[in-house]
Amino acid sequence: MTITAGIDIGTGAVKTVLFRVEGDKTEWLAKRNDRIRQRDPFKLAEEAYNGLLEEAGLKASDVDYVATTGEGESLAFHTGHFYSMTTHARGAVYLNPEARAVLDIGALHGRAIRNDERGKVETYKMTSQCASGSGQFLENIARYLGIAQDEIGSLSTQADNPEVVSSICAVLAETDVINMVSRGISAPNILKGIHISMAGRLAKLLKSVGARDGVVLCTGGLALDEGLLKTLNESIQEQKMAVVAYNHPDSPYAGAIGAALWGAFRHEKLARLGQQQVAEAA
């Protein structure tokens, strides 16, 4: 039996999970998602980790492996670090075993990953454009419009005449939005227009990694934006791709989940290797 932690330090949030792994059986012990805002992400990660240990009734010495991903490599108490594309792919397959591609839509970047049934990465590609296709841009626009971030998706679905943001540059795109507001364009039509622009780029990103059919799982901070998900599937259909994008209630935790599971795998592999060396020495 292995008790493992996964800590995903992103640009906008720290996601932390605890798992108990025994063979093919995994038990999710605790989870936590903390927005960073203006706090130190590493102190926040340590606080979150200690909070999960307390919630699960564990001590730090009970944890066999602390795996980090994202920006977590500098975390003082981590055991090992895994690249984000590796952890998101593994976490996606844990959440949806049918997932053969992943769209990680984060605060600063979008990333498309093609993976196999085990969650092993086959290929990936990141957005190379400026941040107008990112979660941070969408959050800034929501703040300017005076709406809560969790209202963006539902408002977008109410649009009747969306105004598409044409600029790739975040600064110019924000100027476009300011002009739209001055022209009396409604918030739903502005948000739907932003979703259309973002979804078009994300669909092209999926196509570029060879995601031709099957299930795509959205992960990252924008995965639960239902308006973006709906628009993404519309863009996928327009580009004649035979894939369907889904999310999962725990999609934001995919990176942390994948880190924890890869950490358990590495710990068990090292344990077997150590046992083999002892046996050979005897």
Curated annotation (Swiss-Prot):
Origin superkingdom: Bacteria
Enzyme Commission (EC) number: 1.3.7.8, 1.3.99.n1
Keyword ATP-binding: yes
Keywords annotated in UniProt: 4Fe-4S, Aromatic hydrocarbons catabolism, ATP-binding, Iron, Iron-sulfur, Metal-binding, Nucleotide-binding, Oxidoreductase
pH dependence text: Optimum pH is 7.2-7.5.
Pfam families, per the entry: BcrAD_BadFG
One record GO biological process: catabolic process
GO-annotated molecular function: 4 iron, 4 sulfur cluster binding; ATP binding; benzoyl-CoA reductase activity; metal ion binding
Catalytic activity: cyclohexa-1,5-diene-1-carbonyl-CoA + oxidized 2[4Fe-4S]-[ferredoxin] + 2 ADP + 2 phosphate = reduced 2[4Fe-4S]-[ferredoxin] + benzoyl-CoA + 2 ATP + 2 H2O; 3-hydroxybenzoyl-CoA + AH2 + 2 ATP + 2 H2O = 3-hydroxycyclohexa-1,5-diene-1-carbonyl-CoA + A + 2 ADP + 2 phosphate + 2 H(+)
SUPFAM superfamilies noted in UniProt: Actin-like ATPase domain (SSF53067)
Cofactor(s) it depends on: [4Fe-4S] cluster
Cofactor note: The iron-sulfur cluster may be a [4Fe-4S] cluster.
Residues where [4Fe-4S] cluster binds: 130, 169
CDD domains hit by this protein: ASKHA_NBD_benz_CoA_BcrD_BadG
Coiled-coil annotated residue ranges, if any: none
Assembly with partners or alone: Heterotetramer composed of A, B, C, and D subunits.
Function: Catalyzes the anaerobic reduction of benzoyl-CoA and 3-hydroxybenzoyl-CoA to form cyclohexa-1,5-diene-1-carbonyl-CoA and 3-hydroxycyclohexa-1,5-diene-1-carbonyl-CoA, respectively. The enzyme also reduces other benzoyl-CoA analogs with small substituents at the aromatic ring.
The protein's name: Benzoyl-CoA reductase subunit D
Species of the source: Thauera aromatica
Gene (name only): bcrD
